[in-house]
């Protein structure tokens, strides 16, 4: 299975969730914003959002500044 992640093809196992994807990218404990098929998700929905072939994702990491 493959998804589009930040504009690039990204192979991944079937039946993966947003939570699983973030863990595989090393972002599980980082503050991020996830857009799934052009819809921004709440973090509470990451576990229940199962990814499908050809889904489109944008993941933006949040960095504090000052």
What are these regions (language model features)?
Residues 1-65:
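Ubiquitin-like/PB1-type beta-grasp interaction modules and other compact soluble beta-rich domains
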């Amino acid at each position: 299975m493959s998804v589009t992640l930040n504009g690039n093809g990204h192979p991944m196992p079937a039946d993966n969730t947003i939570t699983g994807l973030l863990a595989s990218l090393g972002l599980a404990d980082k503050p991020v914003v996830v857009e799934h098929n052009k819809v921004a998700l709440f973090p509470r929905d990451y576990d229940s959002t199962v990814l499908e072939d050809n889904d489109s994702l944008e993941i933006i990491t949040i960095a504090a500044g000052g």
